[in-house]
């Protein structure tokens, strides 16, 4: 899978933060996004996630059927292909006589997707906020499975998957605890676990190690390394840990303003 930005312009209230941005990122890459506070890292990540509209340009995904989120293939592949056609894209898809998509390669206009469709492609971890949902840790992490509710994964398998995510993120012992009873660092790890449970090809993280001690920070970075290099996700991390970025990231993007 490739995630391509073509002359992308992003910013606040119609005011661009940077000149047009053009680059291509790929599955299996761990990308560090660095820059001073206020440089636009968070704005860029939220634009990539579709939480903020871009001002101009395109965000395109080039992928094959085997790399598509399973729920996309089972639920609304035709709506995605149709939207690409309407937006002038070039979906390289064919249909069999039964109506199934048989050709492997697609080019998808990411910005044309609905929020539900985007949620199967990209998940994002934002900095913690004072607002705390009246839910337990387990319930919050289970929310990550909502975009895949039409997938073929059985309820039992989904439960096993969520349980494995809780263990991988080091919060299994907190599963029944209400969110309001957690520290800021624990809440941050819960939101990371929710994004991991969403199981998307693209994972965006905005300062995911805020409020974490040294040991917890190293564990999070190790998890991100595994997600990128072993599970072949595209992982983009906004961080101030410059030593880690230089040592571990496959690519470093610096925003200068």
Predicted regions and their residues:
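The feature captures the beta-strand-to-loop junction immediately N-terminal to the Walker
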Residues: 34-36
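Conserved ABC ATPase signature
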Residues: 178-182
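Conserved ABC ATPase "signature" region
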Residues: 142, 156-174
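H-loop (His-switch) and adjacent beta-strand-loop-beta switch element
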Residues: 251-257
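H-loop/switch region of ABC-family ATPase nucleotide-binding domains
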Residues: 239-240
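Catalytic Walker B motif of ABC-type/P-loop ATPase nucleotide-binding domains
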Residues: 203-206
